[in-house]
Amino acid sequence: MRSAQVYRWQIPMDAGVVLRDRRLKTRDGLYVCLRDGEREGWGEISPLPGFSQETWEEAQTALLTWVNDWLQGSEGLPEMPSVAFGASCALAELTGVLPEAADYRAAPLCTGDPDDLVLRLADMPGEKIAKVKVGLYEAVRDGMVVNLLLEAIPDLHLRLDANRAWTPLKAQQFAKYVNPDYRARIAFLEEPCKARDDSRAFARETGIAIAWDESLREADFTFEAEEGVKAVVIKPTLTGSLDKVREQVAAAHALGLTAVISSSIESSLGLTQLARIAAWLTPGTLPGLDTLHLMQAQQVRPWPGSALPCLKRDELERLL
């Protein structure tokens, strides 16, 4: 016997979270909980403002329609990426397809004073991989900060994310301030330029490896082995169903590319599922899930080791 609940939620964000020039004051989303007999499965639907095609309200309408269809015996999935992902996660839990084992390691997101960062990163246990957002300030400053971190910590590897912020000239200004001897320890730089060809040229000219992120969601993108391209960053909330995520990971691995499962600032419930997906589909690759600290609370399922308060399901607004 099938049954379902849908919950709507809103989590206050820390001050200073800015996405594409917009301040994100709250993270808004939905949960779906599916039951079939004794089995239960949860999924999170949280379109990311400025990145998702669909709004929260559109996702809610699509989710409620899909849930009603599922209750009537339908087996299809919605079209909207965030709804397809959340619904497919709930089904994957319900049917036991999504393993319980999780990779709760996270490449820490580096913000703040570079000298403080050096101290923090130097004390990191195990493999030292960290993420730095670039393109928010002057390219020269970004280059100097990255160079400082790599110089101060000889076993540090950095993942950089420019979100297509640079012109080819600015990208070159960044590279100019990174010692060529350290560039191999830049694991990859996500989407340095707006145009893919400019990003490819940057990789060839500087020897700094790049990764595709936004490109994966463009209609003309195809998976190819290319000089200077080392990785793809997959954000399931923006991608679609779990099957589509699996297809993209498989396509990347077939070409020898690293596939990184990455957060779209999901709640703790969604992040714990992404940690399980990462352990399942990309074992051995550190996922990009260090975003919980941007929020003021957890919900339903806590992230191991987090001190943030965690709301229970009965504290959420139920829609169905």
Curated annotation (Swiss-Prot):
Annotated pathway: Quinol/quinone metabolism; 1,4-dihydroxy-2-naphthoate biosynthesis; 1,4-dihydroxy-2-naphthoate from chorismate: step 4/7; Quinol/quinone metabolism; menaquinone biosynthesis
Cofactor or coenzyme needed: a divalent metal cation
InterPro entries referenced in this protein's UniProt entry, alphabetically: Enolase-like_C_sf, Enolase-like_N, Enolase_C-like, Mandelate_racemase_C, OSB_synthase_MenC1, OSBS_N
Keyword Metal-binding: yes
Residues the entry annotates as binding Mg(2+): D161, E190, D213
Entry's family note: Belongs to the mandelate racemase/muconate lactonizing enzyme family. MenC type 1 subfamily.
Protein name: o-succinylbenzoate synthase
Organism from which the protein derives: Salmonella schwarzengrund (strain CVM19633)
Organism ancestry: Bacteria, Pseudomonadati, Pseudomonadota, Gammaproteobacteria, Enterobacterales
Gene that encodes it: menC
